[in-house]
């Protein structure tokens, strides 16, 4: 028996298919400009984008001279994502989450550490995690995401753990973005 297909998520599956070049072209060469990395902009222009993805010649996006067109299965994935939304609500996407308490950094063996937070999800079927956004000298940058259940489930607040094990390296702090803002968390 084949496994059920994963519901496409804008930030995980759709946005990464739009390269920096695609974004630059669509924000400078198209009127009105479309920011291909912005959920609301892509949703507002979804029909035009799909027409361009299916198009040929100068209507094709991305153009043949710049690495296009998309493979058919990418277009199918975009269409599957479109089916997860409505005129009122954009397709399936992540939301910034809020931890129930402070972020915790636990020392493990040697230089290993574990970042964790508890999040109360609105229903069963949700997922939470820390997305690693960047690593620079002295810090690691994260975003705390919640993926809502799809299809939506009845309200049933459920505590979930977001965890990221990591090697401390030279990191003195973690910078975590969540629904309440940006937080500096010291690494012990």
Task: Name the predicted role of every residue range.
Residues 100, 123, 178-181:
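Glycine-centered tight beta-turn/hairpin loop motif at sheet-sheet or coil-to-beta transitions
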Residues 158-188:
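A short amphipathic beta-strand at an alpha->beta junction
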Residues 111-151:
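Mature extracytoplasmic domains of secretory-pathway proteins
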Residues 8, 111-115, 138-140, 156-158, ...:
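Residues at beta-strand starts and edge strands
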Residues 1-92:
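Aromatic- and Gly/Pro-enriched helix-to-coil junctions and flexible linker segments
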Residues 101, 149-150, 187-188:
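Intrinsically disordered, low-complexity linker/tail regions enriched in polar/charged residues
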Residues 140-170:
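An anionic, turn-rich surface loop/hairpin at beta-sheet edges
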Residues 91-120:
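Transition segment at domain starts
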